[in-house]
Amino acid sequence: MRLVSLRNATIRHSGTPALENVDFHIDRGEIVTILGPNGSGKSTLLRSIIGALPLSSGTVERAQDLRIGYVPQKLHIDPTLPLTVERFLSLPVRISKTETENALAEAGVPGLRKRQMTGLSGGQMQRVLLARALLSKPDLLILDEATQGLDQPGSAAFYQKIASVRSQIGCAVLMVSHELHVVMAASDRVICLNGHVCCEGAPAQVASAPEYQALFGSGTHGALALYRHEHDHSHDCDHDHAKDEHEHA
């Protein structure tokens, strides 16, 4: 089932295109990662997907009654503000103790209900933000650099939990990430963005694409190529590199 689809999406800021002629889609159960340098339009694309930013031209279609959960990069909370995890999860609509406990357990942090938000570690904070996103029972879970500031083991544990959540509730997951090694292990499909879609496809295919290497350098290819995708996904670069490899084999 297709959850969100953008066609020829263009967004301009003061006349300058931030995104130009972008085609995008995500289906139920998929894990899709968007990669791109700073200023490439990743956050702009996310905002257009959730409906927070209108398109200058093009079309966007969302499944009827689509529920979206969103985990931001970070959340600033005034350190002088007394705010428990339970109260945070109840804003702006109060939820029951059982709902709070279930959401925290689903996110892998049971027992934090009475903790102060300002006393949480980085990893605990991200799990609480995940719990909040899961309260709506989302069809689509969006993670915007959600592991920024976590160490590698913390990031790996967080993404393992995301994979578990996807399996449990059957949602699609859309990630923006700079952690290339995690992308390869976690994604069904990778989209390389730089104001437009440079290339798209299964992770191993994108890693070998010249468009990808022009943005991230060929030195990343060795680490990324450790991943071997088990399924045959389409590859939608300006040039079909998978076809070239077959013809020259």
Swiss-Prot record:
One term under GO cellular component: plasma membrane
GO terms of biological process kind: response to zinc ion
Tagged with keyword Acetylation: no
Gene3D superfamilies hit by this protein: P-loop containing nucleotide triphosphate hydrolases (3.40.50.300)
Residue ranges the record marks as coiled coil: none
Binding-site residues for ATP, renumbered to this chain: G36, P37, N38, G39, S40, G41, K42, S43
Enzyme Commission number(s): 7.2.2.20
SMART domains, A to Z: AAA (SM00382)
Annotated catalysed reactions: Zn(2+)(out) + ATP(in) + H2O(in) = Zn(2+)(in) + ADP(in) + phosphate(in) + H(+)(in)
Domain ABC transporter: 1-219
Keywords per UniProt: ATP-binding, Cell inner membrane, Cell membrane, Ion transport, Membrane, Nucleotide-binding, Plasmid, Translocase, Transport, Zinc, Zinc transport
Function of the molecule: Part of the ABC transporter complex ZnuABC involved in zinc import. Responsible for energy coupling to the transport system.
Family from the record: Belongs to the ABC transporter superfamily. Zinc importer (TC 3.A.1.15.5) family.
Protein name (record): Zinc import ATP-binding protein ZnuC
Lineage, highest ranks first: Bacteria, Pseudomonadati, Pseudomonadota, Alphaproteobacteria, Rhodobacterales
